[in-house]
């Protein structure tokens, strides 16, 4: 069962999640220098090809995600990476800061390993698009951020910050719409919000089941979506699917 929390396949209804992750690397490569890149929470290794010919080093806490990657990888918590200070020109952290309760430690670690003039790019889902005002719906997420919260998080460790939005095409938004409606129906079945009392592991199973059922439907839109269905923009960031923060070191 796969939800897109860790994009491991482009098969079937999971193709849009795969393309969304790949597009983040491709679109954000423009901010990076030519030197070595540290990829925090790298998963199965999109950066190896998408950021080439730069040297990339992948960091992930899950050893199985790193297995078979033809590059240097490090099994480690991205909040405490066993590499020296000022050892990379760039850092990327794609869809990862939301998976720890203290994302400020991830941002501080990215700053620590960067050389003067370095750049870090953080991509995370937009809370205003996928969440509720008072609740994180994705049980795999410890935090979800709006544009100003992300700006503040990165500004605490970096000398300059730019926040942009990663937007989906009309086709991508049309694919997401039924999932949002399904989630709304599920929430209406629990008007007393009893779900908030359930253990996180139970919520994760329920979430997996709901999205897996949604993505198994025969939807030609899923197969048609590619990286060309995503774009970066500095306007109307609050409406974006994902948020992109570019932190710069003086």
Regions found by a protein language model. Name each.
Residues 95-99:
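A short His-aromatic
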Residues 101-105, 132:
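Short N-terminal helix/helix-N-cap motif within the alpha/beta-hydrolase-1
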């Amino acid at each position: 069962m796969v939800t897109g929390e860790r994009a491991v396949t482009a098969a079937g209804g999971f193709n849009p999640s795969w393309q969304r992750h790949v597009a983040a690397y491709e679109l954000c490569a423009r901010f990076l220098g030519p030197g070595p890149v540290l990829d925090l929470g790298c998963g199965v290794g999109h950066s190896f090809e998408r950021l080439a010919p730069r040297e990339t080093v992948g960091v992930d806490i899950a050893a199985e995600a790193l297995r078979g990657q033809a590059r240097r990888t490090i099994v480690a918590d991205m909040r405490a990476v066993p590499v020296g200070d000022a050892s990379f020109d760039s850092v990327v952290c794609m869809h990862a800061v939301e998976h720890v309760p203290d994302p400020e430690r991830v941002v501080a670690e990215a700053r620590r390993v960067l050389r003067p003039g370095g750049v870090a790019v953080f991509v995370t889902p937009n809370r205003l698009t996928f969440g509720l005002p008072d609740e994180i719906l994705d049980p795999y997420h410890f935090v979800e951020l709006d544009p100003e919260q992300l700006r503040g998080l990165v500004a605490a460790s970096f000398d300059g910050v730019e926040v942009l939005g990663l937007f989906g095409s009309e086709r991508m938004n049309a694919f997401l719409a039924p999932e949002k409606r399904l989630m709304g129906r599920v929430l209406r079945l629990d008007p007393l919000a009893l779900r908030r009392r359930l253990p996180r592991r139970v919520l994760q199973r329920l979430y997996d089941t709901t999205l897996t059922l949604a993505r198994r439907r025969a939807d030609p839109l899923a197969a048609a979506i590619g990286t060309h269905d995503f774009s970066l923009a500095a306007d109307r960031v609050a409406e974006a699917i994902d948020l992109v923060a570019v932190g710069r070191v003086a």
